[in-house]
Amino acid sequence: MLKKTLESVLSTKESDELISAFDQIGHIIIIRIPDSLTSKKKLIGETLLDQVKSAKSIFYQSSSVDGEFRTRDLEILAGEDKTETEYKESGCRFLVDVRNVFFSPRLSSERTRIAEFVNDGEVMVNMFGGVGIFSIIAAKMKKCTVFNIDINPFATKLCKKNIAINRLAGNVISIHGDASQVINSQLENKSDRTLMLLPEKSDEFLDSAILSTKSGGVIHYYSHIHADKKSDAAKLSEQHYMQITPVKSTILGSKIVRPVGPRFYQTVVDVKIKK
């Protein structure tokens, strides 16, 4: 879509160099531009603002997602220099600040998949819950209680607002803090289901996920895996989990969530544990 939108201002060669996808979150569009085209970034931004009628702000992502809060550097190219927006998904409304919190619209199908897994009456711990999108969608679809933990105070503040917007006070509980510390102090053996939505640190936090999960409960273990063949990625993730887990585990399923680089994939392994 991005290449088609910009075909009037870029040559065929330039268009071929362009990263084809962009993220639209509410009224905000975030694009990545290769070094060879940064001299034209303002033109690209202005053209997108003109062509995409629902957009009010075009930002250039000038860094990868990084740091303790998993944020990215953004540069305004066109429109309003405003990073907070409203995002809608699965009948829910969310306030998101794209500069100060981590959020990806590309995980919508995974959010629905997790919500469909949840049973009425369950308690779920979302260890890296951000602004609460996974948690709120699950609580909206099923009668469950979700503890949404995040170390980023901006995310925790927005999560509390999103809980109120979606009228889920008491169903989703926003907790600010390090997931391991929160679980140790408050949530040991509390969850029927635990989400580990920080794939780059899942191995580090697996013991905490197990601590929070009741015997017979389910852990959704996300990771980044290298695979020469895409078809091998999910199976390699299963093997890795089984090598590192300290508890008896039954694999319920696994899948690729999305590619994240050449021969690298974000995967999820769904496991039932016994303690």
Where are the regions a protein language model picked out?
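SAM-dependent transferase fold signal centered on methyltransferase-like domains
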Residues: 1-275
